[in-house]
């Protein structure tokens, strides 16, 4: 979606359809008339800045895209977009660094909206020792490194399960954001050599682990994602912290041995 070539009504309609809402559904959620919403979408009525932000809130549109809606309607963007090293984000940057450091000796990393690496703690690099150098050159894309044939893929024991998990996660990101760059990444990753279809998880499984073969043995990790709770800056809204935890005591011991020899 390009706010410079599409009218604001068309953009709103695309977001409504992306959220699988009828005009009646959105009008009821936003407490406006269906007629007025229809007029906004077809260009017969020009929405106020407040109305645009209200509709964007109901549609859960990302901050970056809310700025594009405002621009398409002739209004100034509302949400700042600073680089992570901007002095205004010093507090947030310190929080990220503190969280990454505090998670050691377990791996943790910060990524942007396209899954490009922004920062990582000292436990990440030893896990990437078998990755081709060109994949580690900035911008390092975490999903590409995970699934590329010259990345971690040959070392992931349950590659079929992990690949299916990552692609589904990326598909959900695309669904939420409508980001064409993420779609391009999805198409690229989907085109990598695919392992046999994943077998079902054990009946007592509650999540998909990452089972990684390393020089000291096979480690099993579970992961969590942390985001800032109330961001009003585009960069912070799109930043995620991925933290890995050993799934069992044996993996924790293997990780300790790997880091001791790094």
Language model features with spans:
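A short, Lys/Arg-rich alpha-helix, primarily the initiator
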Residues: 1-19
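Recognition helix of helix-turn-helix/homeodomain-like DNA-binding domains
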Residues: 31-46, 56
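Hydrophobic protein-protein interaction segments
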Residues: 88, 97-106, 111, 118-262
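Short amphipathic recognition helices of helix-turn-helix/homeodomain-type DNA-binding modules
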Residues: 50-53, 57-89
């Amino acid at each position: 979606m390009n706010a410079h070539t599409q009218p604001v009504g068309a953009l709103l309609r695309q977001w409504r359809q992306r959220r699988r809402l009828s005009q009646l559904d959105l009008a009821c959620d936003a407490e406006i008339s269906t007629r007025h919403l229809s007029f906004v979408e077809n260009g017969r009525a020009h929405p106020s800045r407040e109305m645009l932000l209200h509709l964007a809130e109901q549609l859960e549109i990302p901050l970056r895209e809310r700025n594009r809606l405002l621009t398409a309607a002739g209004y100034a963007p509302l949400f700042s977009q600073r680089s992570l090293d901007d002095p205004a984000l010093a507090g947030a940057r310190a929080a990220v660094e503190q969280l990454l450091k505090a998670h050691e000796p377990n791996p943790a990393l910060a990524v942007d909206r396209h899954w490009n690496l922004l920062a990582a703690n000292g436990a990440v690099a030893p896990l990437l020792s078998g990755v081709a150098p060109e994949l580690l050159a900035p911008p390092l894309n975490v999903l590409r490194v995970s699934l590329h044939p010259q990345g971690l893929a040959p070392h992931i024991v349950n590659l079929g399960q992990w690949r299916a998990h990552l692609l589904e996660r990326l598909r959900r990101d695309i669904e939420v954001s409508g980001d064409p760059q993420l779609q391009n990444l999805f198409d690229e990753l989907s085109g990598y050599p695919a392992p046999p279809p994943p077998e079902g998880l054990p009946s007592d499984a509650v999540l998909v682990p990452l089972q990684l073969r390393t020089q000291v043995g096979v480690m099993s990790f579970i992961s969590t994602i942390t985001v800032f709770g109330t961001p009003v800056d585009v960069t912070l809204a799109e930043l995620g912290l991925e933290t890995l935890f050993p799934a069992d005591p044996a993996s924790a011991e293997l990780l300790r041995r790997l880091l001791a020899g790094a």
